[in-house]
Amino acid sequence: MPSVIEARGLRFAYVRVPVLEDISFSVEAGDYVGLIGPNGGGKTTLLKLLLGLEKGSGEIKLFGTELAQFKDWHKIGYLAQKSPVSQSRFPVSAEEVVLMGLSSRRGSGVSAGELRQVYDAMQKTRTREYAGRIFHDLSVGQQQRVLLARALVSRPELLILDEPSTALDAESREMFFNLLGELNAKRGVTILLITHDTGEVGKYISKFMYVDKKLVFFGTKEEFCRSNEVAEKLGAFAQHTIDHLHNHGHCPLGCSCGGGK
């Protein structure tokens, strides 16, 4: 079975200033990858390269198909850090925003099947109660949950999420990460997620990927927590992340930090 994401030799620069250098990795079906690293390290740019939203050099395959030939966008749900929908003032309802996530939709009619998908996605994200409200009248946290529903509406096999919990309150964050964990564990949805919230999401993540212009680390949570080499490479950031996992009880059994349970 081909990798869900395969990247080889990715490079990107803004006006000749390197942002990403020689990034290579593979994400397998069923992985839950936490993409971490310092601000300005190229994490968001990397996601945009994978989705064809930025153009760099190197090779990208999605579900075994070269990015330039990839057509099955319904297999991918994407939640950007700054969504164009959030920045637009066009008066659309929350339900209409979710409907936008059906990439295969054509024409003005909405089928019964599409409505069922919208209902299911909004039910999962607890946004059904304000389906008819204007999107921009919602709070920032409510908007974020609607945008998650839009990412889920096509029932994707891969979710790519850029700091999705930033605007959420504690209760919504817990719901959000529990939902992602369930989608990964029970439905086999592959997840690639930029996060600084390693405590709450740490119990679900299976692999960590650390990017700071270059790929510094890619491996399992166990390798991340137990390896002295990782701590030496990443320094204070690694220790902060491991401490966060430890404090929430999500370090693997036998982790050298003492947090395994």
Each model region followed by its residue ranges:
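Conserved ABC ATPase signature
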Residues: 134-138, 142
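Conserved ABC transporter NBD signature motif
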Residues: 58-72
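Conserved catalytic motifs of ABC-family nucleotide-binding domains
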Residues: 155
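ABC ATPase nucleotide-binding domains
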Residues: 222, 226-228, 232-261
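Catalytic Walker B motif of ABC-type/P-loop ATPase nucleotide-binding domains
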Residues: 159-162
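H-loop (His-switch) and adjacent beta-strand-loop-beta switch element
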Residues: 207-220
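Conserved ABC ATPase "signature" region
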Residues: 99, 112-130
